[in-house]
Amino acid sequence: MSNNKTFRLKFWGTRGSIPCPGPETVKYGGNTTCFEIHCGDRRIIIDAGTGIRLLGKQIMLEEQNYLNADLFFTHTHMDHIQGLPFFAPLYNPESDVRLHAGHLGGQKYDLLGIIGTMLMKDPVFPVPSALIEKACSFNDYPCGKVFDLGDGIIIKTGKLNHPNGACGYRVEYDGKSLAICTDTEHYEGKLDEEVLTLADQADVMVYDSAYTDEEYPKFKGWGHSTWQEALKIADKANVKNTFLFHHDPSHNDERMDQIASEVASINSTARPAIEGEEVSI
């Protein structure tokens, strides 16, 4: 049994809605959502936005394109799945990747249906999902389920306030915890109890902060929150470190620096997430 107790998070994609690479997003990143989490020798991935392609490239170069991991989806809006067909390890039939989604109950398609009949299906995409199915299993679960992945890894799930549904995650390992709370919209006048439960006493929380409070009224009902709400959750839940996430495509590096400065003046343990950054938990 390994003595490795590493617990770390890497941001492979921090942007929301649509990838926006270019000279104005070099610092905070232009790829859409993808998290890589290491718990000892185990690897967990959350979401498959465009950032997952770079993760796959690393696995291909360093691990002979073999992957044994659990991949959890917060939901299946395009910015959270669009990188999946470009994730190289899935095309290795020796890989063992367990895909999980908890937001599709009662909807027309299950996870495999979305991937096989909508995402990886001509004329939208020329490579059929059959080419990844040998490496993958597909698990639709009811949001609220608790996963015991073994090796001391517990993953708790909770419903988020987002169109078509979404699930947040709390990863617990070696006495520490990480909360992933995106995509979600706050409730005006009260804090979201589901989010508070996921974030309770977390060592690290990642929270949907697409907008500022000033911008939010124009986007009410779109399923996203603000950095000001992130700080309220962090304070109420006694979160140790908070990363603002799902950066709006219109927020270039200059604007993100302004937000970072405003946030730091209020809470020194909170700041915007940066693509490529690794965080020890």
Where are these regions (language model features)?
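Binuclear metal-dependent hydrolase catalytic cores
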Residues: M1-A179, K190, V195, M256-I281
